[in-house]
Each structure stands twice: as structure tokens, then as C-alpha cells.
Design a protein with these regions (language model features):
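Bacterial N-terminal signal peptides
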Residues: 8-16
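Periplasmic c-type cytochrome electron-transfer domains
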Residues: 5, 19-285
Length: 285
């Protein structure tokens, strides 16, 4: 009885606190503003064309079997319809790839926020042994021996293929072309009140109000770009040898002193090494 009373009191407190929260306390969810421009890497048609070419080029992986679209398939929302992402040979992935839709609006990249920019993420993913496992110097040599690619680099950046502009090109393609823009919801938020159904409007009201979704999924891109621990239980797949291998490999790569004892996905802690970030993950769009 005492335990039940405690639970009821706790529930009452939570309900009381939640009832004081208004959707007006959070950034509204639309419409999308113009995508932010990186002043050091502004878009041009030549840069976008080069980035698209590289995005779908299998030579950017060490095995020659993977490219960016291996994990970010355009036809499935620029992500994968599977539990885990594709991994380079010799590894398994423990996470699924976030969608690239509207990635140019994101302030945080990758589930644990380890990438400081889209430009650096493109290079990092190419070199990462788990993702594409390509030697970046070898890749630049391959690209510099491709006359068409050399011509495209020169048109886009005034230089021959190099690591920095390789990352720049892929980033500018993603940032300025993979955008929802004119979805029915976008049209609704721009004033077309017939663009979505009455049921969808009611769902939006719940999303912004009683359901409380907007507390984390707010702003035009439906994310606060922050990291949260939502109480995920440990994935039982992590007991398997191949998952233990990737957990420890990544923990060691990210400089965790306790990498040998890691048996769960630490989330944001991998980047910050701060226990306050244990099992926190980025709010997805």
C-alpha cells in the first residue's frame, strides 16, 4: 500500500509539472527557413554535382563495395529500413543511420554528436574502419587519376582532388539538395490548410500539446539538436561476440580508458567522457 501511495503521489507531481508546460515554451515546428549556408563552403551547381558524384561512388570505400548511399538510401528516406546499418567487411554496426533529410539544419551530427561539421563527417566516415575503411591518401590518388573527377574538382573548387574539398563537396550536396521543402506538412505550415487531413491536424495539436512530443522534437526540423537519455534498455544483441567487438573497438577509438569493459552503447559519453552524458543520444528529426 505504501509503495502504491508513493507511485500515485509521484504520478500526481509529474502530471502537475507537465500541465504547466505549454507548446509556446518551445520553438514552433515549421515551416522550414532557408537552409543555413556554410560561408566557407557556399553552394554552386558544380560543387553540388561533384558532391553527388562522390556520394554514390563505391571507390570511396576500401572494399569498393560501399558508398554513402549504402546507409542513406534515397528511396527509403535517406536511411536504411533495417535494424542496423551496413558495416565495412569484418565489422557489424550497432546503430541505424540517421536520415539525411534536412541534415543541413542539424546542429548535431551522428547519434553521439562526435562530428564537428558535415564536411568533417564526410571525411571521417570515409576513413572510419567500421564505415567505409578507405585510406584517404589512397582515395585521393584514385581520384587524381580519374580525368573526369579532376575536371569536376577544378570546376567546383579550382583545385585537384584533395581531402578538404572532398569533404566540402559531399557536404554541400547533402546540405543543399536533401531537403523535404514541399511536403504536405510544409505546405500546410505555409498556409495551405487543405494540404493535410483533419486527423493530421488533430495529431499535430496533440504533438504540440498534451502528448508533449514538442519538448524534444521542436523547431522547423522537429529536433532540439540536443542529447537525451530516454531510459533505453541494454540491447541483448550486445551479448554477441561481433557486437562486443564493435563496442570495444569504437570505445578505444574514441579514447575511453575503460574501453575493455564497455558492454553497452555509451551514447554521447563516447565523445565527452562525461558520465552525465551516459547513454544520451541525439534527438532525431
Amino acid at each position: 500500500m505504501k509503495k502504491l501511495l508513493t507511485l500515485l503521489i509521484s504520478a500526481g507531481i509529474c502530471a502537475s509539472v507537465f500541465s504547466t508546460i505549454s507548446y509556446a515554451d518551445f520553438p514552433d515546428i515549421g515551416p522550414l527557413p532557408p537552409v543555413p549556408v556554410n560561408p566557407d563552403n557556399p553552394p554552386t551547381p558544380d560543387r553540388i554535382a561533384l558532391g553527388k558524384k562522390l556520394f554514390f561512388d563505391n571507390r570511396i570505400s576500401g572494399s569498393g563495395a560501399l558508398n554513402c548511399s549504402s546507409c542513406h538510401i534515397p528511396e527509403t528516406g535517406w536511411t536504411l529500413p533495417t535494424k542496423y546499418s551496413v558495416a565495412n567487411e569484418g565489422f557489424v554496426e550497432r546503430r541505424n543511420s540517421p536520415t539525411l533529410l534536412n541534415v543541413g539544419y542539424n546542429k548535431a551530427l551522428i547519434w553521439d554528436g562526435r562530428a564537428p561539421s558535415m564536411e568533417k563527417q564526410a571525411v571521417g566516415s570515409t576513413k572510419n574502419p567500421v564505415h567505409k575503411g578507405q585510406d584517404i591518401d589512397k582515395l585521393m590518388n584514385i581520384l587524381n587519376n580519374d580525368a573526369e573527377i579532376v575536371k569536376m574538382f577544378e570546376a567546383a573548387y579550382g583545385s585537384k582532388p584533395n581531402t578538404a574539398d572532398y569533404g566540402n563537396a559531399i557536404a554541400v550536396f547533402q546540405r543543399h539538395t536533401i531537403i523535404t521543402g514541399e511536403s504536405p506538412f510544409d505546405r500546410y505550415m505555409k498556409g495551405d490548410k487543405k494540404a493535410i487531413s483533419k486527423a493530421a491536424v488533430k495529431g499535430m495539436e496533440l504533438f504540440k500539446g498534451k502528448a508533449g512530443c514538442i519538448q524534444c522534437h521542436n523547431g522547423p526540423n522537429f529536433t532540439d539538436s540536443d542529447f537525451h537519455n530516454i531510459g533505453l534498455k541494454r540491447n541483448p544483441d550486445f551479448d554477441k561476440d561481433e557486437f562486443q567487438k564493435i563496442l570495444k573497438f569504437d570505445a578505444k577509438r574514441m579514447g575511453l580508458k575503460e574501453w575493455e569493459t564497455i558492454n553497452d552503447d555509451p551514447g554521447r559519453y563516447l565523445k565527452t567522457h562525461n558520465m552525465d552524458d551516459w547513454k544520451k543520444f541525439k534527438t532525431p528529426t
